[in-house]
C-alpha cells in the first residue's frame, strides 16, 4: 500500500452516515488517538460531566460496542462520599437486569492513572433530550410520546419492584437503541431502599431541580419515596408533549416556589385524556398522586393514537471500529491498561456502509466442515501440482491409514472415506488433492494454507481497503490474529509476524491466500510434494458433494488472543479519504 508521506488529513474512526460526502462516508477530524484500556479500545468522547467523561469504545474480545465512563478519583475524593456514591451506583446497576435498564458490563480501577472505569452497553440512538432538540416546536407527536412513556412506565415498574429509586428521571437519562428500545440510565443518585435503615436521606433534594417534587422543594418530613420518580415522570411527559417545562423560575428559589404552588398551564387543543393524566401525576399531595398502576391503566396510555405526524428520528447510527491487531501499552491520558503492545503491528480503523453481512461477532458461532465436503471456493495456488497416487496393499500401512481416517472422522464428524494421506499419515487431503487438515498441530488448511475455522464460512464477506462494519469484524479480524497456541509454540509467528504492513491486497478475498503463500514457506511445499496414499475402501465412489458448512450455535470456542509481541504501542492507520489505495500513518 502506498503511504502518503505528508498527510494533510487524519480521520476520526467514528463516522455518522448522515454526513454524505464520499459514498456515504464522511471523514472528520480526529480529536484524539484511540487508546486501549484493559481490553477496551477507546474512541471519541460522547459526553462530559463534573467528575469525568464518557467515551465510545469497543470490547476487543467480543467486538461489541460499549460506552466507557471515566472518572478521576482525585475529583471524587474532593466530594464528601464521592467514591462511595460511585460504588453504590455500580452495585445498584449490577443488580438490575431488564431490557429497559442500561446494562453494566465491567468496572475497574487503574491505580497508576488514578481513574475509575465503568463499562456500559452502548446505546446509540440518542436520548429523549436529543430527540426533543430535533423536534418541531420542541415537542414530540402524541403517538411517539405515548410510545416512549409506555416504555418508561415499564422501566420504573421494574426498578421499583427491585426496591430501587432512581431519583433523577429526565430526558437526558432516557436513552434509545436504534430498535427504539428505551433504556433508563444514570443511577448516580439512586438509592436501594432495601438497604436503608431510615428514609431521612431521601428527603434531601438530589438530581435536576426542575424535576423535583413539592415534598422535596418544601423540605417536608413525610413523603412517599417511590412517588418521587412518578413526579419526575409527569414532568418528562409534559415536556415531551407540550415542549416546555411545567415550572420555571429565574433562580432556584423561584423555581421551587412555583413547583410548590403547582399551577400548570395546558394548551386548549391538548388531548383531554392527556391533561387528566398529567394532572393526576403532578399532584402536590404525594398521597393523591397517581401510582404506577393507575398510570399504566390510564385511558391515554392504553388507547390507540393515530400517527398524524411522523416520528422524530433518532440519531443516525454510526459505523465503528473494524480491526484491531494488538494490545498496546497506552501512554496517553486514558490508557495504561493493556497487556502489552504489538511492536510494529498496526491498529487499523476503517468503515463499511454495507450492512448485508453475516453476524459472526459471537465466538460461539464457529462453522464446522465435514470430511469429504470441499471448503469454500478459493483460488487454487498449485493447480499444476497434481500427482497420481498408487495404491499399496501393505496391511500395516492400511491399518495406519484406517487409524488416521478414524482420527479425521472424529474431528470432522463425517464418514466419507474419499481421503488422501501423505506417507507419514500426518496430512489429510480431499479427493481433489486439497490439503484439509494437518494432524500434527490440529490445523485447518485450505489449499495448504492455515486458516482459522471462522474463515471457512461460505458466505462471501466483503473485504475492502476501507475496513468493515461491526457485523463482519470478527471474520476479517482473524486474518491478523494468531491462533490460540501462538504464545506457547511461537510457530505461527514464523508465518505472520514478518508482514506487518497491511496492504489492500491483504484484504482482497481473491488474493488473500496468494499473498500469504510466501509466508508459509517450503514446509507446506515439501508436504504437498510428498507421496500420498489413498486410504479409501470405496475408491469407486465418484459422487461429488457440494460444499456444506454448518453453524453450530451450541458449540463453544474461546476467542483467540490478540498478538502481544512487545510492550510498544501499535501504529495507528487511517485510510486516505481521497484515495482508498493509500493510507495515512500516524
From Swiss-Prot:
GO biological process: negative regulation of gene expression; positive regulation of gene expression; positive regulation of sorocarp spore cell differentiation; protein modification process; stress-activated protein kinase signaling cascade
UniProt entry keywords in alphabetical sequence: ATP-binding, Kinase, Magnesium, Manganese, Metal-binding, Nucleotide-binding, Serine/threonine-protein kinase, Transferase
Gene Ontology MF annotations: ATP binding; metal ion binding; protein kinase activator activity; protein kinase activity; protein kinase regulator activity; protein serine kinase activity; protein serine/threonine kinase activity
SMART domains per the UniProt record, alphabetical: S_TKc
Record has Kinase as a keyword: yes
Domain Protein kinase: 40-301
Co-factor(s): Mg(2+); Mn(2+)
The keyword Cell membrane is assigned to this record: no
Active site: 168 (proton acceptor)
EC number of this enzyme: 2.7.11.1
Cysteine disulfide partners in this protein: none
Protein's job: Serine/threonine-protein kinase that controls the activity of AMP-activated protein kinase (AMPK) family members, thereby playing a role in various processes such as cell metabolism, cell polarity, apoptosis and DNA damage response. Acts by phosphorylating the T-loop of AMPK family proteins, leading to promote their activity.
Name assigned to this protein: Serine/threonine-protein kinase stk11 homolog
Lineage: Eukaryota, Amoebozoa, Evosea, Eumycetozoa, Dictyostelia
Gene responsible for this protein: lkb1
Amino acid at each position: 500500500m502506498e503511504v502518503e508521506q505528508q498527510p494533510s488529513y487524519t480521520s476520526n474512526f467514528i463516522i455518522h452516515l448522515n454526513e454524505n460526502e464520499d459514498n456515504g462516508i464522511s471523514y472528520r477530524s480526529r480529536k484524539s488517538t484511540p487508546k486501549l484500556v484493559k481490553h477496551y479500545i477507546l474512541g471519541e468522547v460522547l459526553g462530559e460531566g463534573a467528575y469525568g467523561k464518557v467515551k465510545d469504545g469497543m470490547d476487543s474480545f467480543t467486538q461489541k460496542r460499549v460506552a466507557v465512563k471515566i472518572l478521576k478519583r482525585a475529583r471524587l475524593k474532593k466530594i464528601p462520599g464521592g467514591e462511595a456514591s460511585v460504588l453504590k451506583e455500580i452495585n445498584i446497576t449490577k443488580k438490575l437486569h431488564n431490557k429497559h435498564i442500561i446494562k453494566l458490563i465491567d468496572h475497574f480501577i487503574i491505580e497508576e492513572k488514578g481513574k475509575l472505569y465503568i463499562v456500559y452497553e452502548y446505546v446509540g440512538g440518542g436520548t429523549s433530550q436529543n430527540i426533543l432538540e430535533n423536534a418541531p416546536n420542541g415537542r414530540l407527536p402524541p403517538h411517539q410520546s405515548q410510545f416512549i412513556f409506555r416504555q418508561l412506565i415499564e422501566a420504573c415498574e421494574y426498578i421499583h419492584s427491585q426496591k430501587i429509586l432512581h431519583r433523577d428521571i429526565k430526558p437526558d437519562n432516557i436513552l434509545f437503541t436504534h430498535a427504539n428500545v428505551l433504556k433508563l440510565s444514570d443511577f448516580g443518585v439512586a438509592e436501594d431502599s432495601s438497604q436503608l435503615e431510615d428514609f431521612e436521606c431521601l428527603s434531601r433534594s438530589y438530581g435536576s431541580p426542575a424535576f423535583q417534587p413539592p415534598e422535596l422543594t418544601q423540605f417536608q418530613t413525610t413523603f412517599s419515596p417511590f412517588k418521587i420518580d412518578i413526579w419526575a415522570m409527569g414532568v418528562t411527559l409534559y415536556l415531551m408533549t407540550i415542549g416546555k417545562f411545567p415550572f420555571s423560575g429565574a433562580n432556584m428559589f423561584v423555581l421551587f416556589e412555583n413547583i410548590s404552588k403547582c399551577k400548570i398551564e395546558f394548551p386548549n387543543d391538548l388531548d383531554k385524556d392527556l391533561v387528566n393524566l398529567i394532572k393526576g401525576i403532578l399532584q402536590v399531595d404525594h398521597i393523591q398522586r397517581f401510582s404506577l398502576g393507575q398510570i399504566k391503566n390510564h385511558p391515554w396510555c392504553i388507547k390507540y393514537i393515530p400517527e398524524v405526524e411522523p416520528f422524530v428520528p433518532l440519531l443516525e447510527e454510526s459505523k465503528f471500529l473494524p480491526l484491531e491487531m494488538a494490545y498496546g501499552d497506552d501512554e496517553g491520558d486514558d490508557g495504561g491498561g493493556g497487556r502489552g503492545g504489538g511492536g510494529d503491528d498496526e491498529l487499523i480503523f476503517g468503515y463499511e456502509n454495507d450492512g448485508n453481512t453475516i453476524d459472526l461477532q459471537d465466538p460461539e458461532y464457529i462453522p464446522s466442515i465435514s470430511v469429504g465436503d470441499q471448503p469454500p471456493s478459493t483460488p487454487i495456488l498449485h493447480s499444476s501440482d497434481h500427482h497420481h497416487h498408487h495404491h499399496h496393499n501393505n496391511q500395516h500401512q492400511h491399518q495406519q491409514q484406517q487409524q488416521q481416517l478414524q482420527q479425521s472422522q472424529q474431528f470432522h464428524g463425517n464418514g466419507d472415506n474419499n481421503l488422501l494421506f501423505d506417507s507419514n499419515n500426518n496430512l489429510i487431503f480431499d479427493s481433489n488433492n486439497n490439503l484439509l487438515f494437518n494432524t500434527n498441530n490440529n490445523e485447518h488448511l485450505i489449499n495448504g494454507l492455515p486458516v482459522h475455522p471462522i474463515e471457512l464460512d461460505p458466505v462471501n464477506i466483503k473485504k475492502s481497503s476501507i475496513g468493515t462494519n461491526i457485523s463482519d469484524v470478527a471474520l476479517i479480524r482473524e486474518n491478523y490474529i494468531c491462533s490460540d497456541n501462538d504464545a506457547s509454540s511461537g510457530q505461527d509467528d514464523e508465518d505472520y509476524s514478518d508482514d506487518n504492513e497491511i496492504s489492500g491486497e491483504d484484504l482482497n478475498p481473491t488474493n488473500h491466500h496468494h499473498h500469504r503463500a510466501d509466508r508459509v514457506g517450503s514446509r507446506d511445499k515439501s508436504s504437498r510434494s510428498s507421496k500420498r496414499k489413498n486410504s479409501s475402501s470405496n475408491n469407486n465412489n465418484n459422487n461429488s458433494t457440494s460444499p456444506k458448512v454448518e453453524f453450530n450455535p451450541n458449540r463453544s470456542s474461546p476467542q483467540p488472543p490478540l498478538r502481544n509481541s512487545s510492550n510498544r504501542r501499535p501504529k495507528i492507520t487511517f485510510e486516505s479519504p481521497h484515495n482508498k489505495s493509500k493510507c495515512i500513518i500516524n
